[in-house]
C-alpha cells in the first residue's frame, strides 16, 4: 500500500466550532461559557460582557532612521518598525458584582505561547487570567 500522507480531521486541538446568537466560537466549551455568562448578565450578577478583547502586552518596537535629501540636507527622521506588538486576545471580559474586571479564557490545552502571554498579562495588568 502506498503512503498517502496523513490527513487532519477537524481543528488543531479537536475543538468543534459552534455558532450561538450569530457569533462563531472556537469550541463548544467556549459557546457554553458564553451562554452561562449571558445568563449571569441578565441576572445582574455581572455587567459589561465583551468578547474577544485584545490586551497589548508589548508595544510595537521602532527604530529611528536618519534621512538626507539629494543636497545633503537633513530630512524628517523616519520610524522603521522592527517588531510588531504582542497581543493577548481574551475570550471574555466582564465586570463582577464587586466592580472588578474579570478576564476569562476557555482552555482545553495550554500551549507554551499561552503560558508566556498569561505571565506577561499578570505582570503588566496586575491581575490573573481566569481559566475555564
Ranges and model annotations:
Residues 1-132:
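Electrostatic, structured charged patches in enzyme active sites and in nucleic-acid/phosphate-binding
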Amino acid at each position: 500500500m502506498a503512503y498517502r500522507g496523513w490527513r487532519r480531521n477537524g481543528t488543531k486541538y479537536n475543538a468543534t466550532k459552534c455558532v450561538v446568537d450569530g457569533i462563531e466560537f472556537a469550541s463548544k466549551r467556549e459557546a457554553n461559557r458564553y451562554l452561562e455568562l449571558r445568563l449571569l448578565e441578565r441576572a445582574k450578577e455581572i455587567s459589561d460582557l465583551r468578547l474577544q478583547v485584545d490586551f497589548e502586552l508589548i508595544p510595537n518596537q521602532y527604530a529611528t532612521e536618519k534621512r538626507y535629501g539629494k543636497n545633503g540636507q537633513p530630512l524628517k527622521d523616519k520610524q522603521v518598525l522592527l517588531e510588531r506588538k504582542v497581543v493577548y486576545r481574551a475570550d471574555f471580559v466582564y465586570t463582577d458584582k464587586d466592580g472588578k474586571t474579570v478576564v476569562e479564557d476557555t482552555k482545553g490545552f495550554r500551549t507554551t505561547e499561552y503560558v508566556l502571554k498569561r505571565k506577561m498579562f499578570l505582570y503588566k495588568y496586575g491581575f490573573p487570567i481566569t481559566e475555564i
